[in-house]
């Protein structure tokens, strides 16, 4: 029978690992160490030498060798560890994925052909180390993969919005948090950025408290339809059908088809 280790299980494992650094008594301590290089030994297969590093093995014999070669070590504390996510610096002219709950191996995220949400290119960091989530990338029938982003997001409002009032790229961003200078120096790399140590702390409390589970923030048009007989430029308010209540979207008709669709009540 097929089996899967879900992303949520991986996240739980990462969280459990991070929490283990707080220690239980004096038994849960982690260390990083540096050992002296082992001399070449051509009589042992895969032993390695200066030009061919030894292959790591998961065995007690290998562990004994690590201990024998240790020169010094440093204890790793809870202040030395952070959860991270892939780093995507915002760049003008780049296209980003939008948040969707249904990415899978059939319906992949278009930018990287990712089969899961967490592998998609939908979280960006701007030039001031503010982190945003893309909830709309301008996707429409003419641009099914999304549009190029041309205006850098730089707001800290808790309300999802365009990067500016003049932005015409169709992007809607949600501000998440700002990485502190200390965390940038300690944890940020070319490939990864750190997450907040705890959602809802002093740095993220406002964002967390403003979030609403199950609220619809944006919609996209997949088919504009044809032969609508409403007056040119007419707007129509329609209920959103789903497993929630109170959702409403306003559509605009132009050239006998749906021109725009905007959420007027998120439910």
Question: Residue locations for each model-derived region?
Answer:
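Conserved, function-critical positions that sit in or immediately flank catalytic
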Residues: 166-267
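Tryptophan-rich substrate-binding surfaces of secreted polymer-degrading and adhesive proteins
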Residues: 1-211
């Amino acid at each position: 029978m097929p089996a899967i280790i879900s992303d949520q299980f991986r996240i739980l494992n990462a969280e459990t690992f991070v929490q283990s650094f707080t220690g239980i008594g004096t038994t849960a301590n982690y260390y990083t160490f540096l050992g002296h290089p082992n001399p070449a030994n051509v009589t042992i297969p895969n032993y390695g030498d200066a030009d061919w590093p030894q292959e790591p093995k998961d065995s007690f014999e290998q562990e004994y060798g690590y201990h024998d070669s240790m020169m010094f070590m440093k204890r790793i504390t809870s202040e030395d560890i952070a959860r991270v996510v892939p780093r995507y610096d915002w760049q003008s002219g780049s296209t980003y994925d939008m948040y969707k709950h249904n990415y899978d191996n059939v319906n992949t995220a278009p930018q990287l052909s990712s089969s899961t949400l967490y592998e998609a290119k939908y979280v960006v960091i701007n030039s001031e180390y503010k982190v945003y989530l893309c909830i709309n990338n301008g996707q429409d029938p003419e641009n099914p993969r999304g549009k190029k982003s041309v205006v850098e997001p730089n707001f800290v409002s808790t309300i999802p919005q365009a990067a500016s009032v003049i932005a015409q790229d169709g992007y809607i961003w949600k501000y998440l948090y700002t990485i502190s200078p200390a965390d940038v120096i300690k944890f940020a790399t070319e490939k990864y950025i750190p997450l907040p140590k705890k959602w809802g702390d002093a740095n993220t409390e406002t964002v967390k408290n403003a979030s609403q589970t199950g609220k619809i923030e944006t919609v996209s048009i997949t088919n504009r339809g044809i032969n609508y007989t409403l007056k040119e430029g007419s707007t129509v308010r329609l209920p959103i059908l789903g497993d929630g209540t109170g959702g409403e979207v306003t559509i605009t008709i132009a050239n006998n088809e749906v021109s725009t669709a905007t959420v007027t009540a998120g439910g």
